[in-house]
Each structure stands twice: as structure tokens, then as C-alpha cells.
């Protein structure tokens, strides 16, 4: 439509324009209705009359690129800009202590929502105090406070440093993305909004302001009644908590970080007890005066609206406790006494019953791979060779465990010297990559594992060839290289499968195929560990560890075997429904290839073809309902007993695994699933039509059969 046609249409509409659900009264320019819409009819038509034919409407701050980007992501600003009225905030007004306390809690809640995936435009930037600092150039952010006057009020002394500290914490997280230590949502970057995160603001000045706030509040608290004193002490605790979080984010040294984390764990329960001091009316008043939920209309570019439900202030502080627990957990990794323990620790870190926030995951990567070393101790090559030595042993004339180096190259036969160098280089990259990607979010972790699988396959071929060379030289015949690389390969396949289930990539009617494939891989891995543990050439300490891994794998395998029977039973009883369109042969083949394509073309382990999986499922379907219930009950009972035995016994060889063994938490969650299923199977054995369904229990890795 041309500009001339547009003007004609606008003129024909004049006098009948309706803004929102309100018919604007003539001469009522600037009227704001209950929904927050502003009557701009008169100004709008005056502006359109000034247009000429073929003239483009543009604004120097809104470029063509911005408009295209906004259109592509369905930017709400395209619709909200014309009716948006910026929030007018009087920053010179001195807030009461109760209002400051409420604002602190709301800002912390918004900060945690950002850490867990909400866009800045729906979380932190909605705070007028945060927004006012972020949109100002760093050169204009001093230390005087929010108000422009010469005098500093309580809000400037107390709330201003707190807000600065929150933004500075976000800046530190933001820098982790810029350095490539994290890969999550793009809009985590403040650059997307052309705003500042106080990148160059001196942290020394910030510490001084926070300390001044504490001294000011300490002098004020003695002046007031017990009720107001409780509020001021609550503010003091929140400032001290922010100092502790800032210390953790700085990563100065391990002792300082651990002390700060213990401070956080002590302060959060006290703060949680004072959250209820602020009633709902105060919160609503604060939100109305200092919170702009439509702030995206002021931003140059924003991420698509996600409308992630707010978690609430109480849960936000619970998330801070999670943060402290997770950080203490990864700091334990520096106490691990062996290279194989580091590898196992990182794998187990991916099995936490919640996804740690981004900074925790980047801290794990920073701690494990800092200074081009693994766990601040081994160079990458020696780390990889130590893993092999601890798992299956290495020939004494090949590797020196005292110096952690390969023997001199001139003593390695020229027949397989290049093969040794190729395998060491290849395997080293794989092991370091595995440690690194364990810190990624679950979706990226799975994708990176799939990308790494071909590299592991090549390394496995090289390891087999090298082991044959050693056999020809009358060296140990248990294949030390190929045994360990094959173990790593099976670990990768298992985590690819398990993470696909955790991310709900399989529909319930596809679960039998999934559990059949997983059971097949577990069986191969179980056999590999069993044979390796019995090999006479495996060192005694390695045998102990491999035997323990075998017991863990056996307990996990029995659990998932029980789920294979359980899903077939649920489909029989119509607890899991099968859509009719999925019965088509081509659709079934397409589903199978989509889920298991990375595994289909592997030579080792031999993949489970769809025809073989169908045969396994069909054999189970031939059982009667009662037989399926009995067999499921037997499997889950065996799994429960195995899990209890492994959890109780633990692993006593601290040379390999430290007392904080993450695997135990995962096994406990599997045990909960087994017990829940056993209770439901007992109900089904008495009444096949019992009202049961598959439910997901928070924290458990698998859904369970339970009452509706």
C-alpha cells in the first residue's frame, strides 16, 4: 500500500478510532485508561498529515536492521511502542527500610530468574533502579546514589551499592559467555540491549560502598524499636549475602571461595525467616512504583517473550542455597587423588537431579581445566595416560608413573612410534573435551557428545591397532589402550541415550524401544567390565575400581530392564496409549533412525537394529498380563537390592574416589523410582484396572507408575 493510499485510509477512519477497549473522548489527549493505554489519537493524525507521498518514516535510533530483526522474532515492541508510557520514577524520594527490604528481595528474585533462563527484558531490567544504572554510561555511574541532589539519603547509602553489586555479579557471569566458557541463551549478553553491566566499574570502589552501607546500618539499628530493628538486620544480612556472592564470583582462591560459600549457607536461612515481614500490599506498591513489566518497549533489541512464570522470592533464596551447595560440590573436585576420579566426577556431575546455574557449570570447567592442566595437577597428556594406567595398567617400559611421562621416543620401535603419537594426541583431546563438555547445559552436552563420538571411534581403532603391536612385542595382552577407550566410548553412548530421555525426546509409546536399546548397551558394557576385571594382567587396584563400576552398572541395568517390562505392561493396560498413525512401518523406521542414528553405523559396540528391538518387545508382549507384572516385580526387586548394597558399601579406595561421590545421589534417586514402581505393581497384581498412571516425580531421573 502506498503512502497516499495509507493517508486516505487513515482519513476515512478518523473520528472512529478506538484505542484498546476505550472510545477516546475528543480533546482528551494524554488520557490513560485502566489498561495503561494512552490516547494519542490527535497527535497521531497530526503527524500523519505532515507526511508526503513516497516519503519513508524512520527514526535514527531504529534502523532497518532493527526492524527486520524485530519482525523475524515477533518483537512485542512493534505493537507496544505506540501505546507505551515509560515508568516515571522519583529517585529522589527516600524509601523506608521496609520498602528497601522489599526491593532487595524483588531484585534478587529477578536476578535468579535471569540465571535460570528468563530474558533480561523480563527480569532484571524490569527494575527501575537496575535499569537506570544499566542505561547510564559507566563514566556517569559514580558513588553518590540514585538521586541527583547533593544530599545522600538512606536509599542512596543502602540500596544503591546493593544494586551495583547485583549488576556487577551479572557482569562477571556475562564475561564467562564472552570468554567462551559458557554457551547458553544469547540474550544473556547485555550487548544485545546496548546497555552496560558495569564492566569497568572498580570492584574496590564497590566493596567500599558495601562496607559503608554496613557501617551506616550498624549505627542506625540501635536507634529504633525491636520491630524496625528486625527489618534493618534483614537488610544487613542481604548486603552481607551479596558480599559473599561477589566473593564467590571473583574466584580469588579456593579457601576464600569456600569461606564465602559457608557464609551464604548461614545467612540464607536467616533471610528466609524475614521474607514474610513484607506483606503483599507493600510488594504490590513497590511493583507498581518501581517495576516496569513492559520495559522492552524502551530497548533497542530484545529476545522473544518467553513468559517464564516467576518463581517467587522464597524459591529465589532456595536457589541461592542450591548455588552454594553446587559450588561446594565442584570445589571438592580439587581433592580428588586420581585422574580417573576426575573423569568419573565430571560424568557424575551431569546426573545431578537439577541443572546447576550457568556460573556453577563454568566454575567446574575453570577449576578442572585451568592453566592448561587438568585439576590443577596434570598436563592433558599425562592426565589421559594416568586414566589408562589406573583403569587397565600400562607397560613399565612405555610409561613412567613417577614422572608421568612416556619413555624416550628413541626406545619406541619405529614400527609403531607414529601410531603411539597419534593415539596419545587423539585420546588426550578426547579426554579433555569430555571433562570440558560435562559443564555444558544438558541439551548442549548431549549434542557435543554426539559430535565427539566419531572421534572416540577413531581413537578406539588406533588403540586396538596399538594393542596388537604390544602383543607382538610380548607385552601385556589385555589391551590396556583399547580397554579404556572402549569404556569411554560406552560411557558416551550411555549418556547420549540417558540425556535424550531426560530431555523428553522420546514419546511414551516409544519407550519400549528406548529401554531395549539402553539395556543392550548396558549388557555390552557390563560384559566388558566383567572380563576386564577378571583379566590377570589388570593391576589389583584397577581391578578393585573396575569391580565397583561393574556393581554400579549392574544395579543401573536391572533398574532400566525393569522399565522395559513396565512400559510393555503399561501399553498392554492402556496406561500408555499408542497413536494409530505410529503403526505405519515407514513412520516407525523414521522414528528409530531419528533417535539412534549416531549409534546405527558403529562397528563396536554392535548396534541393536530395529528388527532386533521389535523382536525383543514382541517376545515380551507374548507374556500374559500377570506374567508381565511378576517379571517386572522381580526385576525391580533385584534392582532395589542391588542399589541398596552398592549405596551401603560405597567405595573405600579414596585414592580413586573421594567420599563425596556423586554417583550415590543418582543411585538413591533410582532406588526411589524402584520402590514407587513396586508399590504400584502390588496394586496392579490385585486389580488390573486400578487407576494408575505414569507420573514424573521432581528430582527423580525416571517417571514412575503411581496412583492418579
From Swiss-Prot:
<dbReference type="Pfam" id="PF04112">
    <property type="entry name" value="Mak10"/>
</dbReference>
<dbReference type="InterPro" id="IPR007244">
    <property type="entry name" value="Naa35/Mak10"/>
</dbReference>
<keyword id="KW-0539">Nucleus</keyword>
<protein>
    <recommendedName>
        <fullName>N-alpha-acetyltransferase 35, NatC auxiliary subunit</fullName>
    </recommendedName>
</protein>
<dbReference type="GO" id="GO:0005634">
    <property type="term" value="C:nucleus"/>
</dbReference>
<comment type="function">
    <text>Component of the NatC N-terminal acetyltransferase.</text>
</comment>
<keyword id="KW-0963">Cytoplasm</keyword>
<comment type="similarity">
    <text>Belongs to the MAK10 family.</text>
</comment>
<dbReference type="GO" id="GO:0051604">
    <property type="term" value="P:protein maturation"/>
</dbReference>
<dbReference type="GO" id="GO:0031417">
    <property type="term" value="C:NatC complex"/>
</dbReference>
<dbReference type="GO" id="GO:0005829">
    <property type="term" value="C:cytosol"/>
</dbReference>
Amino acid at each position: 500500500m502506498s503512502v497516499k493510499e495509507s493517508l486516505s485510509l487513515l482519513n476515512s477512519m478518523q473520528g472512529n478510532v478506538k484505542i484498546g477497549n476505550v472510545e477516546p473522548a475528543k480533546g482528551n489527549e494524554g488520557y490513560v485508561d485502566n489498561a495503561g493505554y494512552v490516547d494519542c489519537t490527535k497527535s497521531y493524525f497530526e503527524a500523519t498529515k505532515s507526511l508526503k507521498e513516497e516519503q519513508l518514516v524512520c527514526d535514527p535510533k531504529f534502523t532497518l536492521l532493527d526492524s527486520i530483526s524485530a519482525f523475524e522474532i515477533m518483537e512485542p515492541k512493534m505493537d507496544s511502542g505506540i501505546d507505551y508510557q515509560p515508568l516515571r520514577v522519583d529517585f529522589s524520594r527516600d524509601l523506608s527500610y521496609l520498602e528497601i527490604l522489599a526491593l532487595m528481595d524483588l531484585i534478587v528474585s529477578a536476578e535468579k530468574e535471569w540465571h535460570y533462563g528468563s530474558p533480561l527484558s523480563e527480569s532484571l531490567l524490569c527494575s527501575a533502579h537496575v535499569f537506570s544504572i544499566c542505561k547510564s554510561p559507566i563514566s556517569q555511574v559514580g558513588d553518590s546514589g540514585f538521586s541527583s541532589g547533593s544530599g545522600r539519603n538512606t536509599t542512596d547509602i543502602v540500596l544503591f551499592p546493593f544494586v551495583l553489586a547485583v549488576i556487577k555479579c551479572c557482569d562477571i557471569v556475562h564475561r564467562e559467555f564472552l570468554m567462551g566458557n559458557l554457551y547458553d541463551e544469547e540474550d544473556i549478553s547485555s550487548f544485545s540491549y546496548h546497555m552496560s553491566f558495569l564492566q569497568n566499574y572498580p570492584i574496590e570502589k564497590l566493596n567500599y560502598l558495601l562496607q559503608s552501607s554496613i557501617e551506616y546500618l550498624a549505627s542506625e539499628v540501635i536507634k529504633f524499636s525491636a520491630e524496625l530493628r528486625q527489618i534493618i538486620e534483614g537488610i544487613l544480612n542481604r548486603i552481607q549475602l551479596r558480599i559473599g556472592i561477589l566473593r564467590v564470583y571473583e574466584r580469588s582462591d579456593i579457601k576464600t571461595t569456600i569461606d564465602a560459600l559457608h557464609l551464604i549457607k548461614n545467612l540464607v536461612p536467616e533471610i528466609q525467616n524475614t521474607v514474610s515481614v513484607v506483606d503483599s500490599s507493600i510488594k504490590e506498591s513497590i511493583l507498581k512504583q518501581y517495576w516496569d513489566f513492559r520495559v522492552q518497549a524502551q530497548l533497542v533489541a530484545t529476545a522473544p517473550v518467553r513468559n517464564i512464570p516467576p518463581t517467587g522470592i522464597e524459591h529465589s533464596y532456595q536457589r541461592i542455597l542450591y548455588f552454594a551447595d553446587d559450588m561446594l560440590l565442584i570445589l571438592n573436585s580439587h581433592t580428588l587423588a586420581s585422574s580417573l576420579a576426575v573423569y568419573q566426577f565430571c560424568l557424575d556431575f551431569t546426573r545431578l537431579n537439577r541443572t546447576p546455574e550457568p556460573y556453577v557449570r563454568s566454575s567446574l570447567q575453570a577449576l578442572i581445566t585451568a592453566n592448561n592442566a587438568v585439576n590443577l595437577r596434570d598436563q592433558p597428556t599425562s592426565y589421559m595416560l594416568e586414566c589408562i594406567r589406573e583403569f587397565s595398567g600400562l607397560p613399565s617400559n612405555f610409561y613412567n608413573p613417577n614422572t608421568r611421562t612416556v619413555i624416550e621416543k628413541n626406545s619406541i620401535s619405529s614400527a609403531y612410534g607414529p601410531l603411539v603419537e597419534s593415539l596419545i594426541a587423539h585420546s588426550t583431546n578426547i579426554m579433555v573435551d569430555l571433562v570440558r563438555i560435562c559443564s555444558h547445559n544438558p541439551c548442549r552436552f548431549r549434542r557435543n557428545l554426539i559430535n565427539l563420538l566419531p572421534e572416540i571411534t577413531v581413537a578406539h581403532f588406533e588403540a586396538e591397532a596399538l594393542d596388537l603391536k604390544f602383543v607382538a612385542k610380548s607385552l601385556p595382552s589385555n589391551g590396556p589402550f583399547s580397554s579404556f577407550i572402549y569404556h569411554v566410548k560406552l560411557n558416551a553412548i550411555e549418556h547420549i541415550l540417558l540425556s535424550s530421555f531426560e530431555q523428553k525426546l522420546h514419546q511414551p509409546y516409544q519407550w519400549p524401544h528406548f529401554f531395549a536399546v539402553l539395556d543392550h548397551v548396558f549388557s555390552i558394557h557390563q560384559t566388558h567390565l566383567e572380563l576386564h576385571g577378571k583379566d590377570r594382567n589388570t593391576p589389583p587396584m584397577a581391578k578393585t575400581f573396575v569391580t565397583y563400576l561393574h556393581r554400579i552398572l549392574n544395579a543401573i541395568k536391572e533398574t532400566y530392564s525393569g522399565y522395559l517390562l513396565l512400559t510393555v505392561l503399561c501399553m498392554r493396560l492402556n496406561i500408555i496409549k499408542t497413536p494409530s498413525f505410529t503403526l505405519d512401518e515407514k513412520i516407525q523406521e523414521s522414528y528409530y533412525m531419528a533417535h539412534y542414528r549416531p549409534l546405527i553405523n558403529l562397528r563396536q559396540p554392535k548396534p541393536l537394529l530395529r528388527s532386533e528391538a521389535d523382536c525383543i518387545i514382541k517376545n515380551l508382549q507374548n507374556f500374559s498380563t500377570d506374567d508381565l507384572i511378576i517379571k517386572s516385580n522381580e526385576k525391580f526387586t533385584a534392582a532395589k537390592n542391588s542399589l541398596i548394597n552398592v549405596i551401603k558399601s560405597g567405595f573405600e579406595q579414596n585414592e580413586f574416589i573421594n567420599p563425596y561421590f556423586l554417583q550415590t545421589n543418582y543411585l538413591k534417586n533410582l532406588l526411589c523410582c524402584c520402590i514407587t514402581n513396586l508399590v504400584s505393581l502390588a496394586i496392579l497384581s490385585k486389580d488390573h484396572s486400578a487407576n494408575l498412571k505414569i507420573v514424573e516425580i521432581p528430582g527423580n531421573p525416571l517417571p514412575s507408575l503411581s496412583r492418579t
